[in-house]
């Protein structure tokens, strides 16, 4: 089926049990886009002969040049299963039925919406956006380098979003041709990767959860093996089918024998689970040996043997392919024998959930409102006749400058051209008017890699693009027709924007264009932050050097179209305290009638991370939350119940606790104190950076009897001053962000790595050899501040043999007292204050502390 007509696709969209929404995720350079090509060529949008070289989903010019994927792109595929394969599609909501001659049969056409996502850690926000709109993930692992740090990060994100994984081991051609591994070694390599992936799944998911068991296991067929570049792949099902007739057993029974410790004795023709001299492992004997035989015959140019194999396996070579030899013949041969497209599409159809199955258990993760209102029920049943609920996960720039398609997924109802809908931004609160627009949707479109197709309407369970809502949304949001609908939950990113660059226009007259360009940039990338400082600076914050480089290039060439001046990258810091305040701080209100007494103290280790990770949440039921705090962090239960709020922004990693005893009018000023606390934690006392891991205690409050003398104008500034004073008396410190660096290199280059890391205040905490290969993996912590130019430095010191991957990992205290002149933190504070246009020098305690 080469020519897709929109009507045919539209008909398929209604068969929601036969839809599979999936994304391809992996570590950088493990071959996602190349593998996606063989899927796309099978579904007939690229010509089959070009697959493996075109990287169809890398739509941007810089993606083709750098050979990396930067933005995630979506594409729809159509695939028809053969009759014999339909029995492998199990589960009541996994297939539609059609009537054939009065009998009900499974419908064999599947619509697969595939999203190819980037593997580079700087773009992991793109991955998050892709995961939100899909239900299944194809995890690609390079079988030579194994499970890497980024594989773990994306897999963890997938499981947190309740997305079911299937595994594919890529680059088998390298394992056979470059490393020349034997059959048993190759089996051990595969088994180790499967174990590693299952360890990650077990760590972050649970088998008794609503998704059921999601472990990957080759013997059920949710693990594929192959080579994306050469365009061939298999699961154990393909081989079991070849032998099933010969052995006279069922395919699924045979699959169990083709993996793990199952050995086949050639003399007695029996399977056993112990190895004897006569027996050989099933996987090696029946799966790998035939492949090794083909490789041996073709690569060593044994013409007669090759001809015999061609005949035996029933491969039809075209006339111009008969004269090939060596690697080109290898590709053609394997591609005809074990075509990657068929294998992968079958695995997707069998093992990934349909929207109907997935939305049952994903609804509670996705929807913020009550789980029994009309919208929630419609999402849960994926009901095309319910109210429209659609989540927009990102904006895709169009060829028309400055306009965007909104890209997202319809969870319930139908979205149609020209319909009126409510567009709810991330800050929308039900019942209020802010961040809410009621507008018509101009067009609904189908996303097809590099092309788009207009379409009348799109029902639930599908991925869609919308035209005409981009003016009302910044990065994402919810589109609905149900007036009481709550928002779909905002995405949690695994990295945080810690590197900043200030930009200005070379020609001051271009300033309006720059501002407009920054607004567009903020739309087009789910992660980047554009900040307009009060000092007039324009700041772009990103996840790392590469991310910022791409953002600035986009800004200069696509969004603002003007020449720019860029500052050197600077790092965001956080402020914290190290001990409890050495006195109870007091501040009086401007009219001297109200007094607040407070202290600050550091939080126990791990609590700030728990708040950011969502384990301890501002929206939790307060008794349940107090219980967690008391058990895990040894907080006093009565105090833990009296948490007034989290900050900054109501969700940040700082706490405001009420430890007062019997104070009058306390509730009346609570809002004002909370506002002061949000202000103080958002702009810390040292250098206006966010605070992190500080717990403030309100000890006593003396208030004026007249309500008019204790309004917000009196209390808010006072609260901020008393919080600043309590920080300054509690040994303030700066926190700097730290990358976790994973470096792969040959043994000879390890020495050079240590040298580079030591010069940059980094330290290695783990070094291990990748079993079965000469490569070493070095893991180290490296402060973000020292990471600029790290890659180039590392390559020059190791002769270009080491490849680093940096992921933001944690915050650590910068050694030294920022209040003491001449220390490094003090220098950073002074530089930051100067850059932000604040008063020079750290403010003295007397500015904030009042005498009785």
From Swiss-Prot:
Entry EC number(s): 3.6.5.-
Enumerate the Gene3D superfamilies for this protein: 3.30.230.10, 3.30.70.240, Elongation Factor G (Translational Gtpase), domain 3 (3.30.70.870), P-loop containing nucleotide triphosphate hydrolases (3.40.50.300), Translation factors (2.40.30.10), Yeast translation eEF2 (G' domain) (3.90.1430.10)
Modified residue annotations for Phosphothreonine:
57, 59
GO-annotated molecular function: GTP binding; GTPase activity; ribosome binding; translation elongation factor activity
The protein's annotated catalytic reaction(s) are: GTP + H2O = GDP + phosphate + H(+)
Q: Which residues carry this modification: Diphthamide?
A: 709
**PTM remark:** Phosphorylation by EF-2 kinase completely inactivates EF-2. AMPylated by fic-1.
CDD domains for the chain: aeEF2_snRNP_like_IV, eEF2_snRNP_like_C, EF2, EF2_snRNP_III
Q: What is its main location?
A: cytoplasm
Q: What happens when the gene is disrupted?
A: Ray defect.
User: GO CC terms for this protein?
Assistant: cytosol; ribonucleoprotein complex
- Coiled-coil regions listed in the entry: none
Show the Pfam families listed in the entry.
Answer: EFG_C, EFG_III, EFG_IV, GTP_EFTU, GTP_EFTU_D2
The record places domain tr-type G at 17-356
The protein's UniProt keywords, in alphabetical order, are: Cytoplasm, Elongation factor, GTP-binding, Hydrolase, Nucleotide-binding, Phosphoprotein, Protein biosynthesis
Name one process (GO BP) from the record: defense response to Gram-negative bacterium
Location relative to the cell: Cytoplasm
Task: Family membership, please give it.
Answer: Belongs to the TRAFAC class translation factor GTPase superfamily. Classic translation factor GTPase family. EF-G/EF-2 subfamily.
What is the role of this chain? Catalyzes the GTP-dependent ribosomal translocation step during translation elongation. During this step, the ribosome changes from the pre-translocational (PRE) to the post-translocational (POST) state as the newly formed A-site-bound peptidyl-tRNA and P-site-bound deacylated tRNA move to the P and E sites, respectively. Catalyzes the coordinated movement of the two tRNA molecules, the mRNA and conformational changes in the ribosome. Involved in the morphogenesis of epidermal tissues.
Mind telling me what this protein is named? Elongation factor 2
The scientific name of the source species is: Caenorhabditis elegans
Designated gene of the protein: eef-2
